[in-house]
Amino acid sequence: MLFYHCSSFSSSSSSSSSSASTRRLPFGHSWGTWSTDMCSLGCTVYLGKGDTNSKSNSSLPRSRSNEVSSLLMMWPSSSIVVAVAVSSCPSLKQSISSSADNCLILSWRALDHSAGSLEYTARYM
């Protein structure tokens, strides 16, 4: 289950089938955060300007901050793929950090004053 600061939805994984959910979140000046309960798992973070081939590996509890137009996080051990893509928001600040219980947390903030939207897709396989 994924938890979102601005909105929330839940989806359960299944070994026999896959499910996908996509939602758009409006955001402006405030921070938004989400976390996943898939704790204590290693992660690989891909950072790039819409190009997932340009990747940077990271593992918890290391933190990273950068301006990106797309973010793809994969947990191979659990076969869960979470993709976050930016739509109509040219300036975005994102950070990846670890909470006390070693869950992955993503925070984002708009750097300009224009209203934008964040589109994210969560796929369970």
Curated annotation (Swiss-Prot):
It comes from the Eukaryota. Residues 1-21 are annotated as: Disordered. Residues 7-21 have a biased composition (Low complexity). Almost completely overlaps SEL1. This is Putative uncharacterized protein YML012C-A.
